Amino acid sequence: LEFYRLVNENTSRWILYSDILGGTYLVGILFLIPNLQSGLPAIYIFIPYLIYLLYSFIIRLYLKEENPITSWGHSFLGQVYIALPLGLLSFIAYPPLATEYLLMPYNALLVIAFFSFIWINDTGAYIVGCTIGKHRLFERILPKKSWEGFFGGLAFSLLLGWVWSTQCSFLNMGQWIGLSAVVSIFSTWGDLCESLLKRTLNVKDSGNILPGHGGLLDRLDSIFLASPATVIYLYLLIS
């Protein structure tokens, strides 16, 4: 809801509510797929979502929008940029890893590790950036971020990856450190992408639901690229 209000405040309620329902359903079915025990092919649970996609195209024929192409773009960007990454968090909890891991159908440790890497990356980047940051990372998008802060956050994440490797053996040390690097780098890109979105729309915060901290997008921006990147890493490079 926050995203769609941000990108298009004047959109039709028919579109706004259908986009929210579509995104919510996409997150739900992505969480359901790893637990699908019945013989029902997975494609059947996507049918309502396919109906939403068809509706999104057809409804524009009957609404007098000034720029329906932009409206379509906003609708589908919300699905890909917000709903899909959130739904993919379930695939982090159910990755096809080593035999020891497969004995446990669900294990929250990778999800906890995922968020711990994001947190330590932000913390490390802030500490190092405030202390010695001089060279701007992306001045035209986010002037406060520095290369020193970026590498500081990455170093903190790699160190935490090593700590995780000493406690959890279902990934070896190299895999843990690789995972920490992936989350660190892509969470930084996620932060930059959300800042580019706000700069393009000429807004400071994505919302005001969290006083003093902006909106939910401002708090979750690191997830939106780190989640898909983590799934790719786990499924293609480790499994």
What does each model-identified segment do?
Residues 157-158, 219, 226, 235:
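Hydrophobic transmembrane alpha-helices of multi-pass small-molecule transporters
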Residues 200-222:
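Interfacial loop-to-transmembrane junctions
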